[in-house]
Amino acid sequence: MAQVTLYNIKGEKIGNIEIADEVFNVEPNLDVMWRYIDMQLTNSRAGTASTKTRGEVAGGGRKPWPQKHTGRARQGSIRAIHWRHGGVAHGPKPRNYLKRLNKKMKKLALKSALSARFQEGNLIVVSDIRFEKAQTKQMREVLKNLGIADEKVLFVLPRKEEVYENVKLSGRNIPGVKVIIADNPNNGNPVNIDGLNVYDIINSSKVVLTEGTVRKIEEVLSK
Protein backbone atom coordinates (compact mmCIF):
# COMPACT_ATOMS: atom_id res chain seq x y z
CA MET A 1 0.00 0.00 0.00
CA ALA A 2 1.13 3.54 -0.71
CA GLN A 3 1.93 5.89 2.14
CA VAL A 4 1.14 9.57 2.52
CA THR A 5 2.29 12.10 5.11
CA LEU A 6 -0.30 13.00 7.75
CA TYR A 7 -0.47 16.62 8.91
CA ASN A 8 -2.39 18.46 11.60
CA ILE A 9 -4.11 21.78 10.92
CA LYS A 10 -1.02 23.60 12.20
CA GLY A 11 0.88 22.19 9.22
CA GLU A 12 3.01 19.89 11.39
CA LYS A 13 3.89 16.38 10.21
CA ILE A 14 2.51 13.90 12.72
CA GLY A 15 3.21 10.64 10.89
CA ASN A 16 2.37 8.58 7.84
CA ILE A 17 -0.73 6.62 6.93
CA GLU A 18 -1.30 3.90 4.37
CA ILE A 19 -3.78 4.47 1.58
CA ALA A 20 -5.27 1.83 -0.70
CA ASP A 21 -3.39 1.42 -3.99
CA GLU A 22 -6.58 0.31 -5.75
CA VAL A 23 -8.17 3.70 -4.96
CA PHE A 24 -5.38 6.27 -4.76
CA ASN A 25 -2.62 4.78 -6.91
CA VAL A 26 -4.18 3.42 -10.09
CA GLU A 27 -3.14 4.45 -13.58
CA PRO A 28 -5.36 7.47 -14.42
CA ASN A 29 -7.80 6.74 -17.22
CA LEU A 30 -8.14 10.07 -19.05
CA ASP A 31 -10.93 8.85 -21.32
CA VAL A 32 -13.17 7.81 -18.42
CA MET A 33 -12.42 11.03 -16.53
CA TRP A 34 -13.42 13.04 -19.62
CA ARG A 35 -16.65 11.05 -19.94
CA TYR A 36 -17.48 11.71 -16.27
CA ILE A 37 -16.80 15.45 -16.53
CA ASP A 38 -18.77 15.66 -19.78
CA MET A 39 -21.69 13.93 -18.04
CA GLN A 40 -21.39 16.14 -14.96
CA LEU A 41 -21.28 19.45 -16.83
CA THR A 42 -23.96 18.41 -19.31
CA ASN A 43 -26.30 17.32 -16.51
CA SER A 44 -25.84 20.71 -14.84
CA ARG A 45 -27.57 22.41 -17.78
CA ALA A 46 -31.12 23.51 -17.02
CA GLY A 47 -32.34 22.87 -20.55
CA THR A 48 -34.90 25.69 -20.28
CA ALA A 49 -33.70 27.92 -23.15
CA SER A 50 -36.59 28.54 -25.53
CA THR A 51 -37.26 30.64 -28.63
CA LYS A 52 -40.41 31.12 -30.70
CA THR A 53 -40.77 29.98 -34.28
CA ARG A 54 -42.58 32.18 -36.81
CA GLY A 55 -45.75 30.23 -36.08
CA GLU A 56 -45.54 31.00 -32.35
CA VAL A 57 -44.86 34.75 -32.53
CA ALA A 58 -48.04 36.80 -32.09
CA GLY A 59 -49.31 38.61 -35.19
CA GLY A 60 -48.16 38.36 -38.76
CA GLY A 61 -51.24 36.63 -40.10
CA ARG A 62 -51.91 39.34 -42.67
CA LYS A 63 -49.77 39.76 -45.74
CA PRO A 64 -47.89 43.06 -45.17
CA TRP A 65 -48.46 44.35 -48.74
CA PRO A 66 -49.77 42.98 -52.02
CA GLN A 67 -47.72 40.42 -53.86
CA LYS A 68 -47.37 42.57 -56.99
CA HIS A 69 -47.23 46.16 -58.24
CA THR A 70 -45.53 47.76 -55.20
CA GLY A 71 -41.94 47.51 -56.41
CA ARG A 72 -41.03 45.89 -53.12
CA ALA A 73 -39.86 42.37 -52.43
CA ARG A 74 -42.69 39.95 -51.89
CA GLN A 75 -43.42 39.14 -48.25
CA GLY A 76 -45.90 36.78 -46.68
CA SER A 77 -45.65 37.67 -42.99
CA ILE A 78 -43.97 40.22 -40.74
CA ARG A 79 -43.07 37.33 -38.42
CA ALA A 80 -40.82 35.56 -40.93
CA ILE A 81 -37.34 34.83 -39.59
CA HIS A 82 -35.61 37.64 -41.51
CA TRP A 83 -37.89 40.32 -40.03
CA ARG A 84 -37.19 42.28 -36.88
CA HIS A 85 -39.44 40.83 -34.17
CA GLY A 86 -39.88 37.76 -36.36
CA GLY A 87 -39.54 34.15 -35.32
CA VAL A 88 -36.30 32.19 -34.90
CA ALA A 89 -35.25 29.37 -37.20
CA HIS A 90 -33.71 26.32 -35.55
CA GLY A 91 -33.54 28.08 -32.16
CA PRO A 92 -33.30 26.26 -28.82
CA LYS A 93 -36.31 24.56 -27.27
CA PRO A 94 -36.60 23.07 -23.76
CA ARG A 95 -34.91 19.69 -23.68
CA ASN A 96 -33.48 17.12 -21.32
CA TYR A 97 -29.67 17.02 -21.40
CA LEU A 98 -29.40 14.03 -19.05
CA LYS A 99 -26.39 11.77 -19.65
CA ARG A 100 -25.56 8.61 -17.75
CA LEU A 101 -22.50 6.53 -16.94
CA ASN A 102 -22.55 3.12 -15.34
CA LYS A 103 -21.37 2.83 -11.75
CA LYS A 104 -18.16 1.01 -12.69
CA MET A 105 -17.05 3.88 -14.93
CA LYS A 106 -17.98 6.49 -12.32
CA LYS A 107 -15.87 4.73 -9.71
CA LEU A 108 -12.94 4.38 -12.11
CA ALA A 109 -13.16 8.09 -12.96
CA LEU A 110 -13.04 9.06 -9.27
CA LYS A 111 -10.14 6.68 -8.62
CA SER A 112 -8.30 8.08 -11.64
CA ALA A 113 -8.76 11.69 -10.52
CA LEU A 114 -7.67 10.98 -6.94
CA SER A 115 -4.70 8.92 -8.17
CA ALA A 116 -3.62 11.70 -10.52
CA ARG A 117 -3.52 14.18 -7.64
CA PHE A 118 -1.68 11.70 -5.38
CA GLN A 119 0.93 10.85 -8.03
CA GLU A 120 1.53 14.56 -8.68
CA GLY A 121 2.09 15.15 -4.96
CA ASN A 122 -0.98 17.36 -4.78
CA LEU A 123 -2.98 15.23 -2.34
CA ILE A 124 -2.74 16.40 1.28
CA VAL A 125 -4.11 14.39 4.21
CA VAL A 126 -4.78 16.01 7.59
CA SER A 127 -5.81 14.25 10.78
CA ASP A 128 -9.03 16.28 11.03
CA ILE A 129 -10.45 19.76 10.51
CA ARG A 130 -13.17 20.88 12.92
CA PHE A 131 -14.33 24.41 13.67
CA GLU A 132 -16.60 25.16 16.62
CA LYS A 133 -17.88 28.22 14.76
CA ALA A 134 -17.74 29.43 11.19
CA GLN A 135 -14.92 31.93 10.78
CA THR A 136 -13.06 32.81 7.58
CA LYS A 137 -9.98 33.75 9.61
CA GLN A 138 -9.62 30.16 10.84
CA MET A 139 -9.72 28.78 7.31
CA ARG A 140 -7.12 31.29 6.11
CA GLU A 141 -4.88 30.18 8.98
CA VAL A 142 -5.23 26.51 7.99
CA LEU A 143 -4.37 27.34 4.36
CA LYS A 144 -1.32 29.30 5.47
CA ASN A 145 -0.15 26.52 7.81
CA LEU A 146 -0.42 23.92 5.05
CA GLY A 147 1.42 26.18 2.59
CA ILE A 148 -1.46 26.32 0.11
CA ALA A 149 -2.78 29.84 0.69
CA ASP A 150 -2.21 30.81 -2.96
CA GLU A 151 -3.52 27.57 -4.47
CA LYS A 152 -6.89 26.50 -5.80
CA VAL A 153 -7.90 24.09 -3.04
CA LEU A 154 -10.60 21.46 -2.64
CA PHE A 155 -11.35 20.30 0.91
CA VAL A 156 -13.26 17.03 1.23
CA LEU A 157 -14.67 16.40 4.71
CA PRO A 158 -16.03 13.03 5.88
CA ARG A 159 -19.63 13.65 6.91
CA LYS A 160 -22.31 16.19 7.65
CA GLU A 161 -21.84 17.47 11.20
CA GLU A 162 -22.00 20.97 12.62
CA VAL A 163 -18.22 21.16 13.15
CA TYR A 164 -17.69 20.24 9.48
CA GLU A 165 -20.46 22.51 8.23
CA ASN A 166 -18.63 25.33 10.03
CA VAL A 167 -15.50 24.51 8.01
CA LYS A 168 -17.58 24.63 4.84
CA LEU A 169 -19.01 28.03 5.77
CA SER A 170 -15.55 29.31 6.72
CA GLY A 171 -14.23 28.66 3.22
CA ARG A 172 -17.08 30.03 1.12
CA ASN A 173 -15.76 33.62 0.99
CA ILE A 174 -12.19 32.69 0.08
CA PRO A 175 -11.52 32.77 -3.69
CA GLY A 176 -10.24 29.46 -5.03
CA VAL A 177 -11.38 27.42 -2.02
CA LYS A 178 -14.19 24.88 -2.16
CA VAL A 179 -15.32 22.64 0.68
CA ILE A 180 -17.54 19.62 0.10
CA ILE A 181 -18.93 16.97 2.42
CA ALA A 182 -18.15 13.46 1.19
CA ASP A 183 -21.10 11.88 3.00
CA ASN A 184 -23.65 14.58 2.16
CA PRO A 185 -26.85 12.79 0.99
CA ASN A 186 -28.26 15.96 -0.58
CA ASN A 187 -25.62 16.46 -3.25
CA GLY A 188 -26.65 13.78 -5.72
CA ASN A 189 -23.30 12.07 -6.27
CA PRO A 190 -23.30 8.86 -8.33
CA VAL A 191 -21.43 6.50 -6.02
CA ASN A 192 -22.78 7.39 -2.57
CA ILE A 193 -19.88 9.68 -1.65
CA ASP A 194 -22.19 12.59 -2.23
CA GLY A 195 -20.36 15.76 -3.04
CA LEU A 196 -17.09 14.20 -4.21
CA ASN A 197 -16.81 14.48 -7.98
CA VAL A 198 -14.20 14.37 -10.72
CA TYR A 199 -14.69 17.95 -11.95
CA ASP A 200 -13.92 19.52 -8.56
CA ILE A 201 -10.86 17.30 -8.09
CA ILE A 202 -9.44 18.11 -11.52
CA ASN A 203 -10.39 21.79 -11.23
CA SER A 204 -8.31 22.16 -8.04
CA SER A 205 -4.54 22.28 -7.83
CA LYS A 206 -4.53 20.80 -4.30
CA VAL A 207 -6.94 18.31 -2.73
CA VAL A 208 -7.11 18.17 1.07
CA LEU A 209 -8.69 15.11 2.71
CA THR A 210 -9.09 14.27 6.36
CA GLU A 211 -8.07 10.81 7.53
CA GLY A 212 -11.76 10.03 8.01
CA THR A 213 -12.48 11.08 4.43
CA VAL A 214 -9.75 8.77 3.13
CA ARG A 215 -11.32 5.80 4.92
CA LYS A 216 -14.80 6.72 3.70
CA ILE A 217 -13.61 6.95 0.09
CA GLU A 218 -11.73 3.64 0.39
CA GLU A 219 -14.83 1.98 1.84
CA VAL A 220 -17.02 3.01 -1.09
CA LEU A 221 -14.62 2.82 -4.03
CA SER A 222 -13.03 -0.49 -3.01
CA LYS A 223 -16.35 -2.35 -3.32
UniProtKB/Swiss-Prot annotation:
CC annotations in GO: ribonucleoprotein complex; ribosome
GO MF annotation terms: rRNA binding; structural constituent of ribosome
Quaternary context: Part of the 50S ribosomal subunit.
Lineage summary: Bacteria, Thermotogati, Thermotogota, Thermotogae, Thermotogales
Gene name as annotated: rplD
Stored SUPFAM superfamilies: Ribosomal protein L4 (SSF52166)
UniProt keyword annotations, A-Z: Ribonucleoprotein, Ribosomal protein, RNA-binding, rRNA-binding
Species for this entry: Fervidobacterium nodosum (strain ATCC 35602 / DSM 5306 / Rt17-B1)
Region of interest called Disordered, as start-end residue ranges on this chain: 47-72
The protein's name in its UniProt record: Large ribosomal subunit protein uL4
General function of this protein: One of the primary rRNA binding proteins, this protein initially binds near the 5'-end of the 23S rRNA. It is important during the early stages of 50S assembly. It makes multiple contacts with different domains of the 23S rRNA in the assembled 50S subunit and ribosome. Forms part of the polypeptide exit tunnel.
InterPro entries: Ribosomal_uL4 (IPR002136), Ribosomal_uL4-like (IPR013005), Ribosomal_uL4_dom_sf (IPR023574)
Similarity comment: Belongs to the universal ribosomal protein uL4 family.
One GO biological process term: translation
Pfam family membership, one: Ribosomal_L4
